[in-house]
Structures are given as structure tokens and as C-alpha cells.
């Protein structure tokens, strides 16, 4: 699926921070991860918790934005909030530095579209190397960023061992990312077509779909 990359990405997502903290608590440092069991030891409890939380709002409506999304919007918001965003970014960078000193990192205080993509590819490349995956093509998901797409730098998707990464994207309308100027790679409906002996082919099955038909109604916040 791709969730193993949460142990390596430098983007301070909720999953990455939780994985870093749990790894410290379990004395399971990321640099020692060498097999699936090492990843599952840290990530299985985390994703069990996330799954249980998602099940609470299982009525088909999307949940209100969480803390990580609100923080991302504040830090990568519109130009009219430039001064506020600059002040927040300074505090954010200090917070990231503190987390790195505490051993939760390595993390970077960079939330641009390019960095979100590159960080995921670096992290997935690390997973492939540590698991010893011997394949020409590695198909993954989790980050919801479809690719490689026309216009992407193919070198970013190529691994040192010769494999090529391919992200199937998602089937979730990520209103936060799709609303950004660089949001098209996050458009839902990604798929990878495979056949015997052929090259995997990336498909965009919902291109041109009406956004109103893809967006779930907002669920009320729970007390």
C-alpha cells in the first residue's frame, strides 16, 4: 500500500509524527528497520487507532478538517495572509527543529507541493531498499499523489537500483489539495493497469468528473 513510507518521510504529517514517537517508545529506531515485521511493529498499532477513529464516522460523510490540515492551510495559505503565514512558518520551523532534536525526525519544515511529492518518493525508495524489493516497477499509494504524470521529472520516480515508482493515487476527493494550483495530481480516480509481461499503465478514470459529484457532505464535528 505504501504506508511503510510513514517511517521515513520528512513531511511532518500526523502519521509521521506518531510513528516517530511510537518508534522511540518501542525502542525501534527507523535506521534499524530491515523487514516487514520492523515496520508493522511500529505502524500496526497506529493504523489500528486510525481505523477505529474512521469507523466512528462511518456514515459516508467526510470529517471536518483535522489539526494537521488546519496547520497546513495556515502555513501554505493565500498571499493575503503573507505576514501571518511568515510568523507561523517561523514558529513551525522552530517546532520541527525541536522534534528533530528529540529524535522524532528527521523532518523538514517544507510543505510545498514539490516537497510533498519528493519526500514521498524518497521515503518509498528507502522502503524498497530496506525490504530488498527486486522489481522493475513498484506500484504504491497512500500519499494520494498520482504519478508519474506528463510533465513530471521521471528521474524523481527512478530508484538507484533500477526500479521505477508508480503511485496509483486515490479515490478520495482531497478538497484541501485539489483546490491548490498544483492540485490536479491529487484528483481522485487513479488506477494502474497491469497485464502479463507488459509495462504498468497509469489511468485517470475520473478525469472531467463534476467535483460536486465527488465531494461527500461535511459531517458535523463530534463533541
Task: Please describe what each predicted stretch is.
Residues 2-223:
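Extended recognition/assembly regions associated with phosphoester-bond processing machinery
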